[in-house]
């Protein structure tokens, strides 16, 4: 940013003091942080959905073993042979039951994941565009200090 561009920016935004400029920079930094927080929230939601997807897959994969075991609970040999599959099924099902009344649909989960990814991509674009804005603001802040006769640290 040239000195002239900095002066134009300051005038266009009605900034009349270093204090106002600092407030503007602070507000921009907070907006940038807000975008980052939203992205973290989306990441959390996506992780939960991915975990759910994995549990649904496990339940479907081992359901037959579990049904066979429930149909013949006295068949100890079958239980011993398929103990791992039955246990995986029970754990996955119990996790799903904490959040869902019936087995969630994989397609619905994928749709939600896709929507969240789109939202996140938009936020990422906004976030990266705020990076250059912040760099510009810090340069304007520096130029303002020089313009006013003293170099100021950001």
Where are the predicted features?
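Extended intrinsically disordered terminal tails
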Residues: 1-154
């Amino acid at each position: 940013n040239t000195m002239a561009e900095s002066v134009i920016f300051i005038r266009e935004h009605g900034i009349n003091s270093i204090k106002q400029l600092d407030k503007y920079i602070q507000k921009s930094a907070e907006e940038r942080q807000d975008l980052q927080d939203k992205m973290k929230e989306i990441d959390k939601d996506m992780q939960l959905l991915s975990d759910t997807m994995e549990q649904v897959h496990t339940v479907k994969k081992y359901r037959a073993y579990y049904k066979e075991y429930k149909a013949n609970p006295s068949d100890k040999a079958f239980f011993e042979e398929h103990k791992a599959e039955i246990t995986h099924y029970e754990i996955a099902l119990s996790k799903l039951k904490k959040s869902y009344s019936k087995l969630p649909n994989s397609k619905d989960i994928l749709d939600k994941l896709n929507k969240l990814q789109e939202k996140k991509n938009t936020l990422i674009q906004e976030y990266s565009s705020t990076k250059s804005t912040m760099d510009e603001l810090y340069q304007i802040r520096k130029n303002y200090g020089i313009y006013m006769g003293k170099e100021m640290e950001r």
